[in-house]
């Protein structure tokens, strides 16, 4: 009987990785939900109660909130993509890795091929983060310009 040197994928390990991927996706969705909720609350405050001086401050706070949630969402997407690579490696769907990248049983560490500033930048510029948060920031800047124009005294 021949001994196969290639390790069969462990279903339990793949299940753990898949659960982590799902959790990262849910976290990214929750980041978007909370961002929209907080921005909506700030804009309601801006329209209802804010004085002239605090209108500008409120818009800048809203832009800061968007930047914070964009960073968080990008991080979750970055991790999700790393765990997808780990899933493919564990399932044996990618070519053999170098010896330094070998995984042990039930290893949940993202391999080096799935980490780095380049991968984080790709996650930041993806449609699900870059377009979503970029559009919100553009709309807030347009609102800032509109409130500035509305407050110019007429002669």
Predicted segments, located by residue:
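Hydrophobic alpha-helical transmembrane segments
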Residues: 52-64, 154-155
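Structural signal for the C-terminal ends of transmembrane alpha-helices
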Residues: 45-51, 145-148
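Inner-leaflet juxtamembrane helices
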Residues: 27, 58-111
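Lipid-exposed faces of alpha-helical membrane segments in multi-pass integral membrane proteins
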Residues: 38, 60-68, 135-139
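A hydrophobic membrane-anchoring alpha-helix module
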Residues: 104-155
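Cytosolic-side membrane-entry/anchor segment at the start of a transmembrane helix
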Residues: 1-45
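Hydrophobic, aromatic-rich alpha-helical transmembrane segments
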Residues: 30, 55, 59, 126-130
């Amino acid at each position: 009987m021949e001994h196969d040197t290639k390790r069969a994928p462990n279903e339990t390990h793949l299940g753990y990785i898949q659960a982590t991927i799902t959790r990262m996706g849910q976290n990214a969705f929750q980041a978007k939900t909370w961002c929209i909720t907080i921005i909506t609350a700030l804009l309601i405050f801006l329209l209802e109660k804010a004085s002239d001086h605090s209108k500008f401050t409120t818009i800048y706070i809203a832009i800061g909130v968007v930047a914070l949630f964009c960073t968080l969402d990008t991080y979750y997407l970055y991790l999700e993509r790393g765990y997808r690579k780990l899933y493919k490696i564990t399932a044996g769907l990618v070519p053999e890795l170098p010896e330094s990248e070998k995984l042990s049983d039930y290893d949940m560490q993202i391999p080096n091929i799935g980490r780095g500033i380049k991968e984080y930048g790709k996650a930041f510029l993806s449609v699900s983060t870059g377009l979503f948060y970029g559009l919100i920031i553009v709309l807030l800047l347009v609102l800032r310009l509109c409130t500035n124009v509305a407050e110019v005294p007429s002669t």
